[in-house]
């Protein structure tokens, strides 16, 4: 089991639930826009939020933002260590630094000392796009071992400064390399791991990459917190993260819809019905399994683990629960009958 750190009031690692993170795409110095986006993210289920801090103005906005939100705030720092010091003074809940560009050891020590004084954890954020040049030369490019060496080198640097309140992130856009690096870290250290696939892309492909790269690791017991990085509204990152956690069997945050792919036995127009059920389930928060099956022959049996479901036939279908048939229902009433049963659960 990984060791535990506290990011504000959220425990990360040490057996705590895998937490969902996102990152604002507003200008951090625009306090109103940033706060409004964070409030939307909170409502969607985000539990830790990160903001970019490229300027002193952005760093000085931290206290005003923190005063109006309800989840921990993380500062993303590149190049200028003094911005990390300002954020620490402003009450930030965690600081993310990149070992490839933060600078000399004295600068890292200054950040570590400031965080140690205030109980602020540091996330070592290694990115394939900004690996140290000597590692790129040594390994001939961005490899899993290069990512791990960068992270562990910075862990040692922080440890030398007497700092141990650490989590680690190693991200690149190539899923197999990403997964290999995280597996290696999982074997080499007990610091909590922040999972993600960087530059994953737009939702269509980015969710797929993240489902494999993050979900695969979660299924192996690797990872303590995650962010799904998408070229989209950050709320979509949170929705995708919740779905990945649910699909991996880690956290239930609502209903799970199962449906068959249809075949020649299907005697009704099932695909639009499945989509209608999916649409209506978005307003349901119950941790239940709902089935939409293609035929009355196999449907109830194949979906016997579902809390409730429907199986279509010619002109009518079956409503069932836990594999037991409840009644026959005319096809045009199937969806309404299904949701009447869901309301009873």
PLM regions: where:
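Active-site mouth loops of central-metabolism enzymes
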Residues: 15-33, 52-54, 71-79, 135-148, ...
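Catalytic alpha/beta core domains of metabolic enzymes, predominantly
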Residues: 126-127, 135-282
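Hydrophobic faces of well-ordered beta-strands that scaffold small-molecule active sites
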Residues: 18-24, 49-51, 73-77, 95-97, ...
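Glycine-rich, proline-tolerant flexible connector loops at the mouths of alpha/beta enzymes
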Residues: 25, 30-31, 42-65, 96-104, ...
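Hydrophobic or amphipathic alpha-helical targeting/insertion segments
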Residues: 82-123
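Alpha-helix-loop-beta-strand connector modules within alpha/beta enzyme cores
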Residues: 55-77, 110-122, 182-193, 277-281
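N-terminal amphipathic alpha-helix/helix-capping segment at the start of soluble metabolic enzymes
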Residues: 1-23, 116, 279
């Amino acid at each position: 089991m990984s060791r535990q750190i506290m990011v504000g009031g959220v425990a990360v690692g040490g057996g705590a639930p895998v937490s969902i993170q996102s990152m604002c795409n507003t200008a951090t110095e625009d306090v109103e826009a940033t706060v409004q986006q964070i409030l939307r993210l909170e409502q969607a289920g985000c539990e830790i939020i990160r903001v970019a801090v490229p300027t002193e103005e952005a760093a000085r906005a931290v206290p005003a933002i923190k005063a109006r939100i309800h989840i921990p705030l993380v500062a993303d720092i590149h190049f200028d260590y003094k911005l990390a010091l300002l954020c620490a003074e402003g009450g930030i809940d965690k600081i993310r630094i990149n070992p490839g560009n933060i600078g000399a050891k004295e600068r890292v020590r200054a950040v570590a000392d400031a965080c140690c004084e205030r109980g602020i954890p540091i996330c070592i954020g290694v990115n394939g796009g900004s690996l140290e040049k000597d590692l790129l030369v040594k390994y001939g490019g961005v490899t899993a071992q290069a990512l791990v060496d960068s992270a562990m080198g910075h862990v040692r640097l922080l440890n030398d400064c007497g700092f141990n309140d650490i989590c680690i992130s190693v991200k690149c856009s190539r899923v197999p390399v990403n997964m290999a690096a995280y597996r290696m870290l999982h074997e080499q250290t007990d610091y909590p791991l922040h999972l993600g696939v960087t530059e994953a892309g737009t939702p269509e492909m980015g969710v797929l990459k993240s489902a494999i790269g993050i979900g695969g690791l979660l299924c192996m017991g690797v990872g303590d917190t995650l962010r799904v990085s998408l070229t989209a509204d950050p709320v979509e990152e949170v929705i995708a993260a919740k779905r990945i956690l649910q699909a991996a069997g880690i956290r239930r945050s609502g209903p799970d819809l199962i449906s068959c792919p249809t075949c020649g036995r299907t005697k009704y127009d099932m695909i639009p019905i499945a989509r209608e059920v999916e649409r209506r389930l978005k307003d349901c928060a119950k941790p239940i399994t709902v089935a939409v099956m293609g035929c009355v022959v196999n449907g109830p049996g194949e979906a016997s683990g579902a809390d409730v479901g429907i199986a279509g036939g010619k002109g009518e279908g079956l409503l069932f629960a836990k594999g037991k048939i409840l009644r026959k229902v005319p096809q045009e009433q199937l969806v309404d009958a299904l949701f009447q049963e869901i309301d009873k659960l």
